[in-house]
Every structure is written in C-alpha cells, then in structure tokens.
C-alpha cells in the first residue's frame, strides 16, 4: 500500500473558541456558515450527501445546500438519479460540510422528505435558463455514449422552448433533510480536537461533548 508523504507532526495553530454546547444548534450552524461564506473561496454551501441502499451499500457525492431553517436542510436534484432512488428506498441520510480554511466540519444525520411542488417550482424558476434546459436534457446517472448526445438533447429542448417559459420537469425536485443529530467538529493542536453533538428528542435538543 502506498503511503502519503505527509508529516504527522502537528503544528501549532491559532485556536478557535471552544464550541458552546449551551447554544442553539441552528444558531451555531448559522454562525459557522456565515464564517464559511466569508472565508471559503469556492462553494461554502457544498456538502457531502451520503445515502445507502436498503441492504446497507453506501454511496456519497457533493451537492449544494440551497436553503435551510430549523425544520431542516434542502437540496435539489434529479428524482431518477442514484441518490434519489436510494433516498426513496431508505430515507436515512447523512450530510457533511467541511471547511478546510476554517478547520471545521459539521455532520448532520436525519431523514429525507420531498419538498412541495410549490417550493420546487420556485427554486427551479430561479435557476439560470441553461440549467433549467439541462434538467430536461440530462438523464442523470444513466449511461451516456457520447458527449454529442447530451449536446443534441440540449439543442432539442432549447429549440422546443425557445424564449418561452421552461416548466419544471416532473423528474426534478428537492429533498428536505430533517435532522435528528448535528455534530460540530473543530480542529485543535495535536489532534486534540473539539467535538460536540446535538441530538433531537421530540422537539427538544440536548448536547454533549465527545472525545476527539
């Protein structure tokens, strides 16, 4: 097995304040996301979405958080993609935000439900026109013989809709992740990291620190 040529010697870094476990987890998420928006050069709303088949075979990919509140976290996708098929069969998912520049991550576990048609329509209409056309042209996760086939399909739907409105495809919508666990992780010197997990029981949240 090839080893990476990286040093295991930890260097001292500017320490962040300890995670406040008395805080509301959503207020803490908002503060960390605000820090990420100021510090991260690329897509601070990027998150890893992990799904699994009913028999436990996992898969993961990067998606973009598009909205959130205390009810949960929303992303949009093709409903015929692998992730959507796995969510339909097993709605338990995990999200992971990693902000390297801040040396922080947030891990969220919860269950998915579909967003409403009104929510999906409103977000779809806000997308760039070429992205809306692409949602019609692409059979996401299906085999593609040649790139020219995708370009041909895009040309066809562009001609079909012209300068008129582009409706949302029936196979395109969003998923709402309703969290039952939110873990905050912060890098500290010598791998003695700061971890805290907030867990939902009913409508109440409780928090505890974890060993790093």
UniProtKB/Swiss-Prot annotation:
Tell me the Gene Ontology biological-process terms attached to this UniProt entry. Answer: pyridoxine biosynthetic process
Report the EC number(s), separated by commas if there are several.
Answer: 1.4.3.5
What the entry lists under InterPro entries is as follows: Pyridox_Oxase, Pyridox_Oxase_CS, Pyridox_Oxase_N, Pyridoxamine_oxidase_dimer_C, Split_barrel_FMN-bd
Identify the domain of life.
Bacteria
Pathway where this protein functions: Cofactor metabolism; pyridoxal 5'-phosphate salvage; pyridoxal 5'-phosphate from pyridoxamine 5'-phosphate: step 1/1; Cofactor metabolism; pyridoxal 5'-phosphate salvage; pyridoxal 5'-phosphate from pyridoxine 5'-phosphate: step 1/1
Q: Does the keyword Flavoprotein apply?
A: yes
Arranged from A to Z, the UniProt key words for this protein are: Flavoprotein, FMN, Oxidoreductase, Pyridoxine biosynthesis
Single GO molecular function: FMN binding
**Protein's UniProt keywords contain Oxidoreductase:** yes
Please give the subunit comment from the record.
Homodimer.
Q: Please state which protein family the record places this protein in.
A: Belongs to the pyridoxamine 5'-phosphate oxidase family.
| Protein name from the UniProt record | Pyridoxine/pyridoxamine 5'-phosphate oxidase
- In the record, what lineage is assigned to the organism producing the protein? Bacteria, Pseudomonadati, Pseudomonadota, Alphaproteobacteria, Acetobacterales
Query: Gene encoding it?
Result: pdxH
